[in-house]
Amino acid sequence: MEKLRLLGLRYQEYVTRHPAATAQLETAVRGFSYLLAGRFADSHELSELVYSASNLLVLLNDGILRKELRKKLPVSLSQQKLLTWLSVLECVEVFMEMGAAKVWGEVGRWLVIALVQLAKAVLRMLLLLWFKAGLQTSPPIVPLDRETQAQPPDGDHSPGNHEQSYVGKRSNRVVRTLQNTPSLHSRHWGAPQQREGRQQQHHEELSATPTPLGLQETIAEFLYIARPLLHLLSLGLWGQRSWKPWLLAGVVDVTSLSLLSDRKGLTRRERRELRRRTILLLYYLLRSPFYDRFSEARILFLLQLLADHVPGVGLVTRPLMDYLPTWQKIYFYSWG
């Protein structure tokens, strides 16, 4: 037990001292998950396990860096715990679905889907109604920008002391002065002005308080949160081949977005969330039964056409053609 505690402390120290290397590790783990997909039997489950682990690793490392840098989330401790649990569920939901299908079959798979969606809905309702958290965003916790947030200042960089950069007279290239060059492990290779702009923008995003929602916006958000449960309930009533669950979910999503479309004064992150939800309406082209009857043949034909006539594109489109049927059948990929 003592060895595990020491190992944990060493890992925390490594993350705080080498945030850039930690980010590279997270990217490597995520990339490894892509390489595993479709390579052998049960590779999809293993690939998703590695991908879920990479997302949990990002969440863990961000928590370590926030604690070290004292950059707490601008919310209460109880709300932070709810956001963390919601983030964990979003990280592992696909693997839980695939694992349940492998172990318990279709009945176990749908039971796990229903339990996960119910848990997420309860957490989001608490955030919306109890904590007045405003618009629900994805991901629930803003990931840290390692280049701008995880770099401790090396000395006083205030403009009053000395210039942070030098502009070449002939090349107009911006170069950091020697006095403002940070230590090697935390060095940022962009121009100082770029870093400052990103720091300011990311700081505003992290510290921005959610926009208070009126009755209309609260109803819209309630519909958005309830949509997965309504869709699952309609699937149980009318079956997976019926158009009614597809139409019901689409109407609920469009209604929610329509009620939110006139809201002014949203934060940058909330505006980005609304754009994300609007773009996700395209997923209805990939959701059954529309996909089975209309989209599948056309999408596969287009991918095959690109693979046959555009050099190099086949390296991407052929694996995509192989994986698309598997992806489309996973509930949390297409409907989550």
From Swiss-Prot:
Broad class of the protein's primary localization: membrane
Cytoplasmic side: 1-84, 132-336
One Gene Ontology term, aspect cellular component: endoplasmic reticulum membrane
Transmembrane segments: 85-105, 111-131
Segments of this protein annotated with the region Disordered: 142-171, 184-210
GO biological process, one term: ER-dependent peroxisome localization
Membrane topology, from the record: Multi-pass membrane protein
Keyword terms of this UniProt record: Disease variant, Membrane, Peroxisome, Peroxisome biogenesis, Peroxisome biogenesis disorder, Transmembrane, Transmembrane helix, Zellweger syndrome
Ranges of compositional bias, category Basic and acidic residues: 144-160, 195-206
Ranges where the record places region Interaction with PEX19: 221-336
Stretches assigned to the Peroxisomal side: 106-110
Localisation: Peroxisome membrane
Chain segments carrying region Required for peroxisomal location: 66-81
Function: Required for peroxisome membrane biogenesis. May play a role in early stages of peroxisome assembly. Can recruit other peroxisomal proteins, such as PEX3 and PMP34, to de novo peroxisomes derived from the endoplasmic reticulum (ER). May function as receptor for PEX3.
Disease / disorder: Peroxisome biogenesis disorder complementation group 9: A peroxisomal disorder arising from a failure of protein import into the peroxisomal membrane or matrix. The peroxisome biogenesis disorders (PBD group) are genetically heterogeneous with at least 14 distinct genetic groups as concluded from complementation studies. Include disorders are: Zellweger syndrome (ZWS), neonatal adrenoleukodystrophy (NALD), infantile Refsum disease (IRD), and classical rhizomelic chondrodysplasia punctata (RCDP).
Subunit structure: Interacts with PEX19.
Family: Belongs to the peroxin-16 family.
Name recorded for this polypeptide: Peroxisomal membrane protein PEX16
Species assigned in the record: Homo sapiens
